A protein has these predicted regions:
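A hydrophobic alpha-helical transmembrane-helix feature that marks the membrane cores
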Residues: 1-204
């Protein structure tokens, strides 16, 4: 995860200081945003069907994409809003991670509704990128904030159980660890975007 974050930051900085990449991100921002949601979902579906090394390479490639999207967020909202949103999201992530790890409640019963909401929000967000309906913008932003905050707790709890259950299966353990990292990465990324969407419109 640390390597992925370093790659993402490197990608963001290279975009900020290298004009051709800056132009590319500006021209293809909508497609990059959609790809930012589709790629991790695709990896999660294929993770048990393809080689673990390929999965890791795909994850690091996704980290580059995340860096490009963060650079776009800086262009759109400014460094202050972007940084504040990322720090705020990190605080929420830490709290929900602790809750998900230590809670005795069975969170599996929320799995279906959270996953359905996630796919629905991603589809709705992708559509609204083209239509730009203001009321839909706010519905998506606040719904994403609530849903992905909840998903952090659920995913931590779910991965913890999977790791305990498969602790003696090294191959499966590696795949579960990678899947968990990817899911946490996506949860944090979308949570940060939701906060940027809210703070960006509120304070600018």
């Amino acid at each position: 995860l640390v390597i992925a974050v370093v790659i993402a930051l490197g990608s963001m900085l290279s975009t900020a200081y290298y004009h051709p990449i800056t132009k590319f991100v500006s021209n293809y921002s909508t497609k990059l945003i959609i790809a930012g949601f589709v790629v991790p979902l695709g990896i999660s579906v294929l993770i048990n069907r393809i080689n673990l090394t390929i999965n890791k390479m795909a994850f690091f490639t996704y980290s580059v994409l995340t860096g490009l999207l963060l650079s776009y967020a800086v262009f759109k909202y400014g460094i202050g809003i972007t940084l504040f949103s990322c720090i705020f999201a990190a605080g929420i992530f830490a709290i929900m991670a602790l809750f998900g790890y230590y809670t005795k409640e069975d969170l599996e019963r929320y799995r279906l509704i959270l996953k359905i909401n996630m796919f629905f929000l991603i589809c709705l967000f992708s559509i609204n990128l083209y239509f730009g309906i203001p009321i839909l913008y706010w519905i998506i932003a606040y719904s994403a904030l609530i849903n992905f905050t909840s998903l952090i707790g659920f995913d931590i709890n779910h991965i913890k159980k999977e790791l305990i259950l498969m602790s003696k299966n090294e191959i499966f353990l590696d795949r579960v660890s990678l899947m968990g990292t990817m899911q946490f990465y996506l949860d944090y990324f979308v949570l940060s975007l939701a906060l940027m969407s809210i703070f960006g419109k509120t304070f600018t």
